[in-house]
């Protein structure tokens, strides 16, 4: 069978819901936190040179930019289609290009000609360096798009918080540009001490943070669900983390060739109003927000919360279907989803939450729901008398259901 056409057949087979394969991504500069359900023997299955697998990407049409050894389709989600005799796969990216608005909705296709977000788990034993994502204007200088992102810390994946469950956000009010410039100039001299000019917040399971472009942040070691714009632009502004040296190349990572070595260009990437915000927690922290009154939802057999809701570039919800309940959930946009807990039925599919996954094994825990299926309503049945179904749902930009 031709690859073209598999996507349409898969959409038909799933009645508007596509089953996706697990998409694992290694990072050479990180130590895995081992909370994303990969088999203990498989965290280094790609070889020591590639580093440990500490990420799983969801609903991704964005290839991982992971150095010269990056695998051919690394970071790209694939769809599984059962043709009656075997399971075939086609990239979600190719399916979006083939099916266009039929899959992601005409609104997103007409505006973006792509699925413009993805989500991931990142799962590190230690914290990441204080770093920054460029806005659209700065990213355009290297042919990329800017990158807003958001964090949510799922209780199901955080039975331990790792070595440093605190995240540095922004720059302490009163800090001058000259002080930050000196940190950047000192990048190659050991610890440039940039987090001395920041503040850290304790991370709590079941909560999240909003991270717009231009905001310095050093993510803590909780296992994190991270919806984000489909871009991979960043620069590391901290030179030493956990006694590990960060290569200078990563400081200039998002800088055009002609500006490399110009520290003022690095300062220009920083959104100073965002970073010096005296109300950082009030403006960036996200506690879950019920989509409607909780008692009303419980009476219908479910609870749904917005968990990422401060960006127009994407949004995310946590849906809980109570034990034994059968519900039909409607959304105005296409979305990807990942199971966190429980088992049951979703449309024509069996859905379940695996306890352990081998590298290369297929699962029934990740799906992509077309706009048409989402707006008509997805029927979910919880087949357990005790265990709730919990899933995380990630949406594209301009979600009509989200009031910012």
In which residue ranges do the predicted regions lie?
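Transition-metal
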Residues: 1-178, 241-282, 316, 404
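A short hydrophobic beta-strand segment most commonly corresponding to one strand
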Residues: 128, 149-153, 220-245, 379-403
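Intrinsically disordered, low-complexity linker/loop segments enriched in Gly/Pro
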Residues: 154-212
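Loop-centered beta-sheet repeat module
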Residues: 189-249
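Short acidic-glycine-tyrosine-enriched beta hairpin
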Residues: 197-210, 347-380
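Functionally critical, mid-to-C-terminal surface segments that flank or help form catalytic/ligand
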Residues: 267-334
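Short beta-strand segments in beta-sandwich/barrel cores
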Residues: 326-327, 342-348
